[in-house]
Amino acid sequence: MEPTMNRQEIAFLNSLYLWHTERITKQECLISLKEILEKTVPLEKIRQAKEEYLSDGELIYFYNIADKAEGEEKADLMESAHAICKRLVSENGIGTDISIYELMMDSVASYYGNAGKYDRSDEISDKIIKEDLVLRRMTMLHESIYNKLWNHSERIKESGGEEDKKFLYEELEKCIRLAELCKEIFSEEFYTKKQKEVSKK
């Protein structure tokens, strides 16, 4: 690893640490992450899809920037993230970059769901689930199942319909078991809490 990349990675981890420990704001973290990424590649070049090769580190930095951005900037960056993942798959096949694909596309799916684009969100989550099953990976299965469940619930709310408690409970049970197998304690606790809320309805 080159010295520049070493410094870049250390600065990246430090920025996330400062944000997680509430020593800097999300906006300050975002500014720092942009500066870190631009030590090796301009953010604008990525947004305009003019940078053909990005290292795994640069993709992770970009993902974190997109994830922490807000408003129109977030929308623009998420579209760029979607385009990058499509290009990775077309050039290398999904198996080569599956970890990066899962991470970025799960965030894109969540963004589309929050923006009310439920079908687009579901389509991405379905692809993640399918590819994870083919490649025998469990890492993102619970998140993709929960994303689809969240979209389903939002559709029901918007239509004024009544949710199927049994269906919600069973889907959350899947999420709990998968999170447990992956030793994702925080996610397991989150799904368990949601399941208890369903039981009280």
Language-model regions: role of each:
Residues 15, 24-35, 48, 68, ...:
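Long, leucine/valine-rich, helix-dominated scaffolding and oligomerization segments
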Residues 1-32, 173, 177-180, 186-189, ...:
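Short juxta-domain linker segments that transition from a proline/glycine-rich
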